[in-house]
């Protein structure tokens, strides 16, 4: 295991002092020079520690007064520490979790993995050496860091999964109603006359949330007596094994262009493609456009998430909206219930809804 940097050691010591009640919400923290002397470290180290605490929304600064611990000072007793580990890119998860925490004498340090298993691993290794009460995690890979997550459970630290879980882990999961959302968007395409409907997944080895979306796609076609066709299922290759963001982007780009090449070679190409998320939908629309295939005139494309990329350019993407805020709130509530030894359900579904825009149209076959 890697040696912990000095600023992280100071950070974790301050977290322990918060947890044990030695520092209370509203308390003024010692100044930079006091902390330098206390921990025998440089000013740069203390500033990095303060930046980390501030980035986790644990402290706030008052001009000409000092730095204070965030939260409501009327709470009594030791504060709970429940870190949130997320890929990043969707701030609603963190803001919602922190809103719940401020009402429950709890602190939520936020760690972003940038969707990289290696960075997620670094955060988990650090947290295993910290005195925390529970962990909420949105995993960025399907099973890559299962050894570390099992370490939390072995230490009797509750783990709550957000959006997607790990196979074999008996931990609560807070996720969107992915199956319902994908089913409804496929039904919308069928109502518009489409029967040749393809599916674009991130990977053949799907996350649990993506498995549910794919299940909704398959079951809806079967329900409407539309045959499933192997050649209509597309995915990128080995995305779960890519270590860097550059490698991920390259793999995505190759996969989208290969999908378009496969499309052009088909005797009976699909008239619509359901994508597992909005980023895939937007990239696929771009790849189709490079080949002279227009959306929605030549092909309909749908997404999932209702992220900013869905409306970033024409055509705006018909998609399934998730309530990221509700998911963040519920995940933190479940973690708090586990800390209090309350019984909780294993799966908590958050409702989804269809957002109709420009990227699909009616056809006649």
Give the location of each predicted region.
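Periplasmic-binding protein-like
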Residues: 83-84, 132-139, 160, 198-201, ...
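Hydrophobic alpha-helical segments within soluble ligand-binding/sensing domains
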Residues: 172-200, 215-219, 252-261, 322-340
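Flexible loop/turn connectors
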Residues: 13, 253, 257-365
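Alpha-helical recognition/docking segments in bacterial nutrient-uptake
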Residues: 2, 12-16, 34, 51, ...
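N-terminal helix-turn-helix DNA-binding module of bacterial transcription factors
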Residues: 1-76
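An alpha-beta-alpha
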Residues: 185-227, 347-359
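Short acidic capping loops at alpha-helix termini that bridge into adjacent secondary structure
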Residues: 25-26, 195-196, 228-232, 294-300
């Amino acid at each position: 295991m890697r040696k912990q940097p000095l600023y992280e050691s100071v950070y974790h010591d301050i977290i322990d002092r918060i947890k044990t009640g030695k520092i209370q919400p509203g308390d003024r923290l010692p100044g930079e020079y006091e902390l330098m002397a206390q921990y025998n470290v440089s000013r740069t180290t203390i500033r990095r520690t303060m930046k980390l605490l501030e980035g986790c929304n644990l402290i706030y600064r008052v001009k000409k007064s000092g730095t204070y611990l965030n939260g409501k000072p009327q709470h009594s007793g030791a504060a709970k520490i429940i870190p949130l580990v997320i890929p990043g890119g969707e701030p609603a998860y963190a803001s919602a979790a922190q809103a719940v925490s401020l009402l429950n004498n709890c602190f939520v340090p936020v760690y972003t993995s940038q969707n990289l298993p290696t960075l997620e691993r670094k955060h988990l290794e650090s947290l295993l050496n910290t005195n925390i009460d529970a962990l909420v995690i949105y995993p960025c890979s399907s099973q890559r860091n299962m050894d570390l997550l099992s370490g939390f459970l072995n230490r009797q630290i509750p783990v709550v999964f957000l959006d997607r879980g790990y196979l074999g882990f008996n931990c609560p999961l807070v996720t969107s109603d992915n199956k319902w959302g994908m089913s409804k968007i496929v039904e919308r395409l069928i109502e518009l006359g489409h029967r040749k409907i393809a599916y674009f997944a991130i990977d053949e080895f799907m996350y649990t949330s993506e498995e549910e979306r794919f299940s909704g796609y398959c079951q809806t076609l079967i329900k409407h007596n539309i045959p499933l066709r192997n050649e209509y299922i597309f995915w990128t290759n080995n995305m779960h094994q890519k270590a860097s963001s550059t490698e991920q982007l390259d793999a995505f780009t190759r996969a989208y262009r290969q999908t378009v090449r496969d499309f052009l070679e088909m005797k009976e190409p699909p008239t619509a493609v359901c994508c597992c998320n909005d980023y895939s939908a937007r990239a696929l629309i771009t790849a189709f456009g490079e080949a002279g295939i227009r959306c929605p005139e030549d092909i309909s494309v749908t997404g999932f998430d209702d992220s900013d990329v869905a409306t970033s350019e024409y055509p705006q993407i018909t998609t399934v909206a998730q309530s990221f805020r509700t998911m963040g709130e519920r995940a933190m509530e479940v973690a708090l219930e586990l800390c209090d030894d309350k019984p909780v359900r294993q799966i908590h579904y958050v409702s989804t809804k269809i957002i109709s825009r420009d990227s699909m149209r009616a056809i006649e076959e």
